[in-house]
Amino acid sequence: MVPLHRDGAPLFYFFGALPFGQPCRNVYFCKIKHGFMTTRQRLFLLSVLLAFAGIPSAKGQRPTSFDSLYSCFSHLSRYNVAYTREQVFVHLDNNAYFTGDDIWYSAYVVYGSNLRPTGMSRVLYVELLNESGNVVQRHRLRVQDGRANGNFKLDETCHSGYYEIRAYTRPMLNWDEAGVFSRVVPVFVRPEQEGAPRQLELRSNVSSHRNRPADAVSLPHGAVEAGGLQVGFYPEGGQLVDGQPLHAAFKVTDGQGVSQRATLRLFSADGREVGRAATRYMGMGHIDAQAQPDWSRVRAELTDEQGHTVSVSLPEAHREGTVICFNAPSADDSLRFEISATPSLRRQLLGVSITCRGEAHYLDTLRMGAAQKMLTLPADYAGQGVNELTLFTPDGRILAERLFWREPDSLARVDVRQNRAHYGACSPVVLKVSVPRYEDYGSNVRFSMAVREAGSDIVRRAPGIREQLLLSSSVRGYVERPEYYFESADSAHRAALDLLLQVQGWRSHNWQQMAGLEPMRVRHPVEEGMLIDGTIYDGSSRRRTCPDYSLSVRIVLPGSNQLKGETRTDSLGNFSFMAPSFYGPAMGVFSARNARDKRKYCIISLHRNLAPQPRAYWKQELRLVPPQLDYTAARLTETPLFSWQDTIRTDIQLREVTVSEKGYDDYYGGRYTWMGGEEYGKKYSETYYNVADEVEQYMDQGFDVPGTYEWLAEKDRRFTLDVTPEGGERLRFMGKQVITVVDNGAGKLLSVDRLDDLRSMMVCTDAAEISRRAPVGQSHRIGCVLFLYTDPAMNIFDHRKGERITRLEGYRAPVEFYSPNYRKTEMPTTTDFRRTLYWNPDVELDSRGEATLTFYSNSQPTQRLAVSVQGFTADGHLIELER
């Protein structure tokens, strides 16, 4: 060890003496013998040290090893300040849905390093994607105190299948797309007779369209196949080194990613067994073996439960390197890393870092001096959750990496008591919610709450905010039952969690970028409000940008309101507006003029096509696992209850109302509403395309809008374009003819050859609709009816040179959750089949940290409650209750 001070303290030590959840900025501590220095002393010493780090050893000479390491240290220490990362968690009211339901959600946006509510981004994007990977609905939400909420309506365009809910802020896209929040929920066909014995029907065809990659299997990365099994080896530190001991995790699955039980044995070149281990949890295990001079001559055998034995290849061994063995935290809660190195590395000065979600917590130098060295550190030298220890050379070459877990602070506790253990039909439900130690959290506790009828749960619950932010976001692939790792703090659960980190560990931050060895490319800015930015191109095939252009924008809101703004493009042709906040859709009219104040043909591109590429579904997340319902007497007695006297009035007061004829806005009348307009097509179609959004994406990217049928054949693999004998093109659906209907038949004479002529497109394969539209006796020749709907909004503006007219989407206004009141305004009914009885995206507490919630059960004769609470406090403590 080469410490900065004589007492052997580390060069940098971050957050070691501070509680979890400090502000999102680095605080630099240098630990000295007489205690901690004052803030002014720390900053002064840090400035001197960082200045020293940039000074070469002598003029014209190469920097020393210490200089190079210190340069890495300084970049690591500043990384989280320069590139602060956010994380998102979305709490849903339910775990599965039926067509026609609403998906209610509450989103939490936090700093990744300390899990405090973000003060950076003010805009959040929440999207609903279908199995094809198409964005069915997109919400742009205003973030306040790290919170936002909304709902998706599963209308006629949302058919049964698996849907993905995705959420992100714009700066989150500067990193790997795997860091975007993503969750898959099943949507079942709504039964014709609700309340009858439940027969679930899920119509899924995940791989039928082109946009989303084929469904994936969460196999061990880097796995090798052995006798039909997939086996992955993961040496601690990242590599197998000749002449060094073996400490490795392994995982065994079948070809579909299902974990398997097996025993792994290692045999030396002379046939001696040098290691044996069995799988423990989810097909994962850990094996140790003494050092071997040549690991390529070691034979590995795997024996499954049926006694079948197959040979397995070990990873390629390296002649030079280091090996790390992490020992579980001891009684004194210290971290112990046993490091072994080959002779060539034992005298080198190396660097050691511990980072947690992009934040540097420990930086130091290390010199082995011997074949093995024990590195012992206090637990508070690490962050809370998944940490990464990295051992590296002065030139930035990583010798070894090891992910490990540090137990976080306890959750902020929330108590929920009920007035009854079970309820009758349409009866009042009263819950008392309280937060013990409310004053300790600064009276700033925010959480959302869902109450479901437990008997209506279809699948097992999804990961909560703790599993998502602390674990799943730092793990590669799909994690089955992440809540298991938090059920208990015993050795079995801790060992399973450590195996998971070794097997599925994923580096959410590129260490080379953190250390300043690779550039960090920032493509997306922080959105502190309604940002409208883009680039102006000259329209030529070279796509040259237009610097020093003046640009004005006119935002036309519903009614007579308008917002106006002006700006100029920079030297690269880029522009940006910070528009006042508005809600709902609007039309934007952009007008550009060159430096001579003349209108010229140009392409005004907007930077709003932010959505990441659709990911592949994991096959494991498509396996529906029913919940484990426990209605035993012991379970009933565990439900916290309180005595309550029903004082709610039972007389229903009906207000006198005046019924008038319902009128319609005829602005978009005529052909646009003929036979119900788009609603008619939605009712009978199986596939819906938001063509208006697709057109905007082409224009935003500066590309020409394609032809209607050319685009459809590229978008949907069921369609093809055939060449007719006359040299024209003919659209076919799965080899059959297509009937095209424009505006439900009212737009027969309209030209729809260009995609920008349309607002939406729907594919109908309903036999009755085909029979009604097809010529007599020709139904068998027709593959589908293609409904095309033209766009009325684009026809109310005059298009001029140097202008672009486009839709602008404002913030999505939150909608209040509907819950009937059977004692005031509504009569009890036998057809109330609500599965979510209560949803509150932001429960308000009084000054004592308490709240009383009252609502009504559904029409089931006997029912129990399932309660879900997720949230956070202002100081970074998480809130999670699933009961």
Regions found by a protein language model. Name each.
Residues Y83-Q87, L128-Q137, F267-R272, T355-H361, ...:
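Short beta-strand and strand-turn-strand segments in soluble, beta-rich domains
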Residues A107, E164-P171, T390, S868-F872:
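Internal, hydrophobic beta-strand segments that form the core of beta-sheet-rich folds
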